[in-house]
UniProtKB/Swiss-Prot annotation:
Span of the signal peptide: 1-23
Superkingdom, taxonomy of origin: Eukaryota
Taxonomic source organism: Caenorhabditis elegans
Fibronectin type-III domain segment(s): 533-628, 653-750, 755-849
Purpose: Required to confine migrating sex myoblasts to the ventral muscle quadrants during their migration through the body and for multiple aspects of sensory, motor, and interneuron axon guidance.
Protein's recorded name: Protein sax-3
Tissue specificity note: Expressed in the AVG interneuron and the male-specific sensory neuron HOA.
Length: 1273
């Protein structure tokens, strides 16, 4: 330990001695610069220091500027340049000198020296900072639009160092780094994007460096805001005489000026003015002529703005012609005129006082006697006593309602006690409701009795039937026979038995349906199934308004037990016909109420079972009701009370219908208010124009007078209704008040109630299945058709599939199904209301037996001519006419083609115009000796398409035969008239030589690869060389000219491979270049994958582009000298006298005879026929439909759903040509009902609302435009 300390001390003493010796020797060494001067920038008049340090410290320091010694305080006492003890040069006040002289600015260095030597430091510059006064670009006043970009320009004064630019707004520094909309450009410009009104103000540009700062002149930024609506005018609906205000408020900077104009009409200046506070346009005392469009214009320096609103003027209905009272003898005709005007045009109806039935325009009763013309005239023919009463004509629109009443009095001969009453004819057997198949026959029996024998006539929907129709005949018994039924034969048929004593009627419906529908076909039972006649009714008790009857049941009940009885009566005081008692009668005794005092009555009874109605009993004795006591006094009081109530309820509109709101597909809620308090209102009738409810009611009775809203249910889905409310007073007789205004409403959509039609399931092979269908009828869609849902259920969960298509799809194809497995398939339509009912469950077993059955059915369907001839509804003459027209078209086309090319008829060559380019006036036919070895040529009839590596773009799928179509029928364009112009094929640069498919038409390749969802994507990937759209010049001929065209051009069918040979090598084409391929592999137990095929039409220019080319000619390439000189042969010419010489000399002589200026070639426009021929039955997808079947410009197939319009094997599409929503499927406007007899049969036609007794219903909406069209369906 001691030795270590001793050693350490010794080392330290040695080091100390060495250091001391070195320091003493350093003063004896040459100097060394230890601190060099650095660049300095200083402003004029400021001090500055240039440092310089050297070792040893005794070294002399000398300063130089720009290579010259610096005069310091050592040389000149009063110099402002001072050398410090450390050697640094201190400038007390930097001088800029005059005109650059005596300036302190320059390059400085110091020199350290002693007797041992000297050393020079690095140079350091002293630069003078400066900042000029004037800005190179001064800010200017800027006006900008709000929301756009504003630029305040500024270029700072010249200075050194470069001045830093900042900005002030309203004398406050802008912190641009904290303002995201502000940007300071490198050149000093201030950019505000987007500019806002808050940015308005005074801006100054500030330039700073070490010299100081410069502030620019102030510049004003004015931000103008374009006019913007705070409140746009809205459409207004007002009543005549009211005032209306169109509120139009606009903001902007400066405040916009507002002006009003009326579109295409003068402004009602005497009644229109700008409201206070400039709130809008106000029109006083609105008139119907004021209806129109009013436009609010707002304008300021930043721009203009306009908005319009429509004024709809409502005027309640008023009568131009009121109905007048009439007195008509029995059997005569009563006519009531009724004309109303209003804004909008009022809807009107007739009703008989005391009855709920509404008779709208075009109404025809079941017996045809009562009619309402489209103009509103009510006509009652063959007037009867029962027609007597008051008839009300009511008009209504959204503004209000009005009504007028007229009385009908029927005069008849009095029946005395000595004059026996002879009842009208009685119909023994009548027809029943029937549903029959199209093409079958119908017999409608009508056997009547009476003295004298009554005549029988028939009506359909209230109109006489045309017996002259060869299909319709009437038997001697009165029965109606209709052969070969058609759908227009559907309707309500009424039999009328008439003699001099009166008439009787019997009505029932006949419905005709296709065999493909799901309707239940019902034919009328044999009359032996009906009950026999009950016994003659016995009158037990008679009062002034009631009669009690007793009778016995019939001896035989027919094919079933008696379910009830029907009572009919005849009154000579009420009219010469039988009337029905509407009540349900279950027993053999009944008290009839509501009869008229002092009236005579006669009764008959009919029994009814579930099969139908039996024959009538013997009529009862004639009975007369009694006259009640104090009848006169009560009548006067009642009449007075009724008159008061009627005046108060009908003189003005008491109810205002405010809103009708849709609740769901079958229910709506009505809201109404009383315009004034009326104590006589005891309830309301809610009525409507539209289909009846499902329970056949056309109105709703609201019995509480305090109720102000009500839900009407059991309506039809997706149907338009027009509702109104009628108040009533329930006194001795019910009095109906004036109806309210009317309002329209559309019920919501519901799931389709009908399944898709014509669902077909067909096996293509043991693993492929095709499902096709047609859309259901329009009246069963219950909304807008959105598509279809196909459910496929296998025997294992991974074999199930749920496919959803759009509304235009008509089929799907399932691939890679499991052989031997049983699949259950359901197809249903869907709307916005949901998925509807399916067609049922179809089971398919994927085995050989099923396949053979399906293939046999397919072969039978392919016999198109056989099916056409056997269609009973297609006359042979139509087929002959079509064939004649077809032949005439072909002859005309051939004549036209020949006339176009008449100048080349002497040539033996064939004009080729199938995608090649017309290059010269007289080129000789050029073809390789071995075309199979020359990659430039390819038979135009074989439309193949190869990819870049030479392999076909068509690849085999597991079921290749499903995709292969024989292309022998689409042999290009080889057969063309002769012409002196000859053509070369245009080579496609960059592609294989034999890859020509009718020129360079753009090819689309469908990819039926499996997918797990219902969205399919169209593959548009193409080889790069297919995108080359340039025309390429033809290659020069390299072989001798043959004496005639090669055999393969003369007969394009020669040497063509068979279909099987092409299929075997994996190559084939479909529809002229449309290829199907699959990628990947599928396990046998994988879920079924679907594919839907598109049929793509090529555009007329052959490039695959979607540009329409109507009458456009292709511009040919510029001709060169080589186009007019025949190429030299590649082989020696043949011996003299060969036909080659004759051809060549002839051609050369003709060429020389043309002179120096060759004749211009005549170029045919590239026709559609020159490109890929597609299957004549093929159509573009429904998304690409356009004129000529070409896709719209700039549009692509909708890839969201590739459900296709697949073609049936018989050439037809499984989808209707029109869209599903376009189908005109009539909805039966008449509800099927049990047969009706007598006058109450007219209730069958109460559902015959609207025009021609049909429902006003929305038809399904078309997909191209999205507009709802309302029409009678």
């Amino acid at each position: 330990m001691f030795n270590r300390k001793t050693l350490l001390c010794t080392i330290l003493l040695v080091l100390q001695a060495v250091i001391r010796s070195f320091c003493e020797d350093a003063s004896n060494l040459a100097p060394v610069i230890i601190e060099h001067p650095i660049d300095v920038v200083v402003s004029r008049g400021s001090p500055a220091t240039l440092n310089c340090g050297a070792k040893p410290s005794t070294a002399k320091i000398t300063w130089y500027k720009d290579g010259q010694p610096v005069i310091t305080n050592k040389e000149q006492v009063n110099s402002h340049r001072i050398v410090l003890d450390t050697g640094s040069l201190f400038l007390l006040k930097v001088n800029s000198g005059k005109n650059g002289k005596d300036s302190d600015a320059g390059a400085y260095y110091c020199v350290a020296s002693n007797e041992h030597g000297e050393v020079k430091s690095n140079e350091g510059s002293l630069k003078l900072a400066m900042l000029r006064e004037d800005f190179r670009v001064r800010p200017r006043t800027v006006q900008a639009l709000g929301g756009e970009m504003a630029v305040l320009e500024c270029s700072p004064p010249r200075g050194f160092p470069e001045p830093v630019v900042s900005w002030r707004k309203d004398d406050k520094e802008l912190r641009i780094q904290d303002m995201p909309r502000y940007t300071l450009h490198s050149d000093g410009n201030l950019i505000i994007d987007p500019v806002d009104r808050s940015d308005s103000g005074t801006y100054q540009c500030v330039a700073n460096n070490m010299v100081g700062e410069r502030v620019s002149n102030p510049a004003r930024l004015s931000v103008f805001e374009k006019p913007k609506f705070e409140q746009e005018p809205k459409d207004m609906t007002v009543d005549v005489g009211a005032a209306v205000l169109f509120d139009c408020r606009v903001t902007g900077d400066p405040q916009p000026q507002i002006t009003w104009k009326r579109k295409n009409e003068p402004m009602p200046v005497t009644r229109a003015y700008i409201a206070k506070d400039n709130r809008g346009l106000r029109i006083e005392r609105v008139q119907p002529s004021d209806e129109g469009e009013y436009v609010c214009y707002a304008r300021n320096p930043a721009g203009t703005l306009e908005a319009s609103a429509h004024l709809r003027v409502q005027a309640p209905p008023s009568f131009q012609t009121k109905p007048a009272d009439q007195s008509v003898p029995a059997g005569g005709t009563a006519t009531f005129e009724c004309t109303l005007v209003g804004q909008p045009s009022p809807a009107y109806f007739w009703s008989k006082e005391g009855q709920q039935d509404l008779l709208f325009p075009s109404y025809v009763s079941a017996d045809g006697r009562t009619k309402v013309s489209p103009t509103g005239t009510l006509t009652i023919e063959e007037v009867r006593q029962v027609d007597e009463g008051a008839y009300v004509c009511a008009g209504m629109n959204s503004a209000g309602s009005s009504l007028s009443k007229a009385a009908l009095k029927v005069t008849t001969k009095a029946v005395t006690g000595n004059t026996p009453a002879k009842p009208p004819p009685t119909i023994e057997h009548g027809h029943q409701n029937q549903t029959l198949m199209v093409g079958s026959s119908a017999i409608l029996p009508c056997q009547a009795s009476g003295k004298p024998t009554p005549g029988i006539s028939w009506l359909r929907d209230g109109l006489p039937i045309d017996i002259t129709d060869s299909r319709i005949s009437q038997h001697s018994t009165g029965s109606l026979h209709i052969a070969d039924l058609k759908k227009p034969d559907t309707g309500v048929y009424t039999c009328i038995a008439k003699n001099e004593d009166g008439e009787s009627t019997w009505s029932a419906s006949l419905t005709v349906e296709d065999h493909t529908s799901n309707a239940q076909f019902v034919r009328m039972p044999d009359p032996s199934n009906f009950p026999s006649s009950p016994t003659q009714p016995i009158i037990v008790n008679v009062t002034d308004t009631e009669v009690e009857l007793h009778w016995n049941a019939p001896s035989t009940s027919g094919a079933g037990p008696i379910t009830g009885y029907i009572i009919q009566y005849y009154s000579p005081d009420l009219g010469q016909t039988w009337f029905n008692i509407p009540d349900y009668v279950a027993s053999t005794e009944y008290r009839i109420k509501g009869l008229k005092p002092s009236h005579s009555y006669m009764f008959v009874i009919r029994a009814e079972n579930e099969k139908g109605i039996g024959t009538p009993s013997v009529s009862s004795a004639l009975v007369t009701t009694s006259k009640p006591a104090a009848q006169v006094a009560l009548s006067d009081k009642n009449k007075m009370d009724m008159a008061i109530a009627e005046k108060r309820l009908t003189s003005e509109q008491l109810i205002k219908l405010e809103e009708v709101k849709t609740i769901n597909s079958t229910a709506v809620r009505l809201f109404w208010k009383k315009r004034k308090l009326e104590e006589l209102i005891d309830g309301y009738y809610i009525k409507w124009r539209g289909p009846p409810r499902t329970n056949d009611n056309q109105y709703v009775n609201v019995t509480s007078p305090s109720t102000e809203n009500y839900v009407v249910s059991n309506l039809m889905p997706f149907t338009n209704y027009e509702f109104f409310v009628i108040p009533y007073h329930s006194g001795v007789h019910s009095i109906h008040g004036a109806p309210s205004n009317s309002m329209d409403v559309l019920t919501a959509e519901a799931p389709p109630s009908l399944p898709p039609e014509d669902v077909r399931i067909r096996m293509l092979n043991l693993t492929t299945l095709r499902i096709s269908w047609k859309a259901p009828k329009a009246d069963g869609i219950n909304g807008i058709l959105k598509g279809f849902q196909i459910v496929i259920v296998g025997q294992a969960p991974n074999n199930n599939r749920n496919i959803t298509t759009n509304e235009r799809a008509a089929s799907v194809t399932l691939f890679h199904l499991v052989t031997g497995m049983t699949y259950k398939i359901r197809v249903a339509a869907r709307s916005n209301g949901g998925v509807g009912v399916s067609h049922g469950t179809s089971e398919v077993i994927m085995n050989q037996d099923t396949l053979e059955k399906h293939l046999a059915a397919q072969q039978e369907n392919e016999s198109f001519l056989y099916g056409l001839i056997n269609k009973s509804h297609v006359p042979v003459i139509v087929i002959v006419a079509i064939l004649i027209i077809f032949v005439v078209i072909i002859i005309a086309y051939c004549y036209w083609r020949n006339s176009r090319n008449s100048d080349g008829k002497d040539r033996s060559f064939i004009k080729i115009n199938d995608g090649s380019v017309h290059m010269a006036s007289n080129n000789l036919w050029d073809v390789a000796q071995n075309p199979n070895q020359n990659p430039m040529y390819n038979t135009a009839g074989r439309m193949t398409m190869n990819n870049r590596n030479g392999q076909a773009l068509y690849s085999l799928t597991p079921n290749a035969q499903d995709f292969f179509n024989n292309c022998d029928d689409y042999s290009g364009t080889m057969h063309r008239p002769g012409s002196e112009h000859h053509y070369h094929y245009a080579q496609l640069t960059g592609g294989p030589g034999n890859a020509m498919s009718t020129f360079y038409g753009n090819q689309y390749h469908d990819d039926p690869s499996p997918y797990a969802t219902t969205t399919l994507v169209l593959s548009n990937q193409q080889p790069a060389w297919l995108n080359d759209k340039m025309l390429r010049a033809p290659a020069m001929p390299t072989n001798p000219v043959p004496p005639e065209p090669p055999a393969r051009y003369a007969d394009h069918t020669a040497g063509r491979r068979s279909r099987s040979s092409r299929a075997s090598d994996g190559r084939g084409t479909l529809n002229g270049g449309l290829h199907h391929r699959t990628s990947g592999s599928q396990r046998s137990d994988s879920p079924p994958h679907t594919d839907v095929s598109y049929v793509q039409l090529h555009s007329s220019d052959g490039t695959g582009s979607s540009k329409e080319r109507t009458g456009e000619r292709r511009t040919p390439p510029n001709k060169t000298l080589m186009d007019f000189i025949p190429p030299p042969p590649s082989n020696p010419p043949p011996p003299g006298g060969h036909v080659y010489d004759d051809i060549f000399q002839t051609a050369t002589r003709r060429q020389l005879n043309r002179g120096s200026t060759p004749r211009e070639d005549t170029y045919d426009s590239v026709s559609d026929g020159a490109f890929a021929r597609v299957d004549v039955n093929a159509r573009p997808t429904s998304r690409n439909r356009n004129l000529g079947g070409r896709p719209l410009k700039g549009k692509r197939d909708d890839d969201s759903q590739r459900s296709s319009l697949m073609m049936d094997d018989d050439g037809g599409s499984s989808e209707a040509d029109g869209e599903n929503s376009e189908g005109d499927v009539p909805r039966g406007g008449v509800r099927k009902a049990v047969p009706r007899m007598g006058i109450s049969a007219s209730t069958l036609a109460h559902s015959c609302y609207g025009t021609n007794g049909t429902a006003q219903r929305f038809r399904s909406i078309p997909r191209n435009n999205g507009i709802v069209t309302q029409e009678q369906t």
